[in-house]
Amino acid sequence: TAYEISTRDWSSDVCSSDLSHFCNSMEAINENQLKHLISLGISHHVDQTQLLAYGHDETEDFVFPPELVLIPKTPEEISKVLAYCHSEGIPVTPAGARTGLSGGALPIHGGVMISMEKFNQILHIDTDNLQVTTEPGVITEVLQQAVKAHGLFYPPDPASKGSCFIGGNVAENSGGPKAVKYGVTKDYVLNLEVVLPTGEIIWTGANVLKNATGYNLTQLLVGSEGTLGIITKIVLRLLPHPTHDVLFLVPFFDAATACAAVPAIFKAGIIPSGMEFMERDALLWAKAFTGDETVPVADTHQAHLLIELDGFDQDQLMREAEQLFAVLETFETDEILFADTAAQKSALWNLRRKVGEAVKTQSTYKEEDTVVPRFQLPNLLNHVKAVGKRYGFKSVCYGHAGDGNLHVNIIRGELSDAEWEHELPKAITEIFEEVIRLGGTISGEHGIGYVQRPYMPLAFPEVTLNLMREIKGVFDPKGILNPGKVF
């Protein structure tokens, strides 16, 4: 590797690819080190029950308990911890709300977990400059509602926005339905306060909209998945909040046709604020999970597009809606459902946001976060189904069709342990190879974390991966911070 990683080989896999339900983390802290870290006076957990609770996120099948959980309140406390762990070669895993889907917050090598749950204050809403300064432990939806009270808008809205932390969104470069019009987290981050793995505290940029001063460290930290530093303050730009929106649920008789309609809508000059794709089973499972009895799904409906338009002029929105209908008339669709009340809109969005949870109730599954140019969505969908036929698994697909981000859920169903453990990686590799061939990549918003590491060589040649390792080595010479993630 490009740098020495303490005295241990943190880069080796602790847990084999058999998707074990429980993985024993390495013992990385000796008794004297544990006593010293506890003596720092930071709130902590060492009870085994608590450690187990912190040892998982929303990734299917993995639990890696840390040896010590520290819950600091200030950057200076984090600095003391990291400086000591750097000197001792102790692995440190930063964690937010642990809602991630790639194992990014799993302490796979034991050691210390630093939980950011007490960094939960919105520090300043600047209504003149349309900015907000926040700590990373603020729940994303809480932040959105706080700025909305001032007529302002923070668009990125991952499905877990009601529970995830804004710091985790920055670490993962999270997206969500509104990314199709408004972009993802990186498009709103202006400046970050970060504690480096060696203990230094820095700001990465400036609280301005334009900055051509030196390397863009801010954007390097966004999406770095907790491997380069621990974010302690975030400055975000905001927008005026749209005053009007309209929402439509469009049923299609063929799933690939629904995907094909997506680029046609954009080609017509329409930029939706949301364009979500749901295969038949995705919507049916969400309806069953939520108890919905209002949204009709006919036997002939194979997929739906949930399309939102927003803006500041109701008449203009109606004109855009007419344009949208004109495009949809060129495809075979059934009767379009128009949500004309806030309650109806909320119910439709709730169905879409609950698809992921609904899938969990059906079977053991593996979710992939593929993204391709949106005109390639029909080809990707057809390939996923073809791979499923070859390997004998069912798949349920849904996601952010407007930006080509298709969540592929591989359902275990009746597959044997051997088939699931040994054939699944082959099937995923075939899907990812096609994604790359179509001009896409292996993760649009969930990140690489722990579970997607084996597939990184499909996305990048070795020279690029080595460059990433070199960057990691500059920030983290001993490789203590979130080891075993990304590459």
Residues of each region from the PLM?
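N-terminal flexible segment immediately upstream of the FAD-binding catalytic core
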Residues: S20-A83, G100-L130, A159, A282-T294, ...
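Activity-critical C-terminal alpha-helical subdomain
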Residues: E200, R453-F487
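FAD-binding subdomain of flavoenzyme oxidoreductases
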Residues: Q121-E276, L481
